[in-house]
Amino acid sequence: MGINLFWVVRLLLEQRSVQLTEDEQRLRQFCFPLLNPADVARLCRMGTWEYIEVGTCLVEHDRTLARLSVIVSGKADVRLDGVKVAELGDGQFVGQIAYITGEKAPVSVVAQASMRIISWSRVKLETFFKDRPDVEIQLGHSLGADLTRLLKSAWQSSR
């Protein structure tokens, strides 16, 4: 009983004391609305925050990806055989198809404007998810919703 009470108190204190930065709050709003601030903060500490310049290739067609990224701010083009087929913006995942399937990237993704992203290595995420399957489920929901938006956008623009 004492051990359980310890963990309950620790979790409550952890939840209460977490202050997310503006970028972390945006990430939570876009991708992880059901996660508590402490879990979002953990994910953010595990990730690598980067500024990306215009023209930078984030995903190269037919290459294996070792990371999953989210655009916190900025825009990127999704290209298939050099032709723009979709556009990604704030709160959208980069490389989600390759991450989900574990296969090579079916498209290229190139920054069309300066961007701020956060990325996680597949290995770090898989290690984290062993102890936190609830966070993995939330990521799966977010990836599915984002992929649905991307496919719907591509379908509508092809009409």
Please tell me what each predicted stretch does.
Residues 5-8, 39, 86-144, 148:
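Cyclic-nucleotide recognition modules
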Residues 14-15, 81, 119:
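Short, flexible segments with low predicted structural confidence
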Residues 26-81, 86-98:
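Regulatory nucleotide-sensing modules
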Residues 3, 23-30, 49-52, 118-123:
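Juxtamembrane/interfacial segments around transmembrane helices
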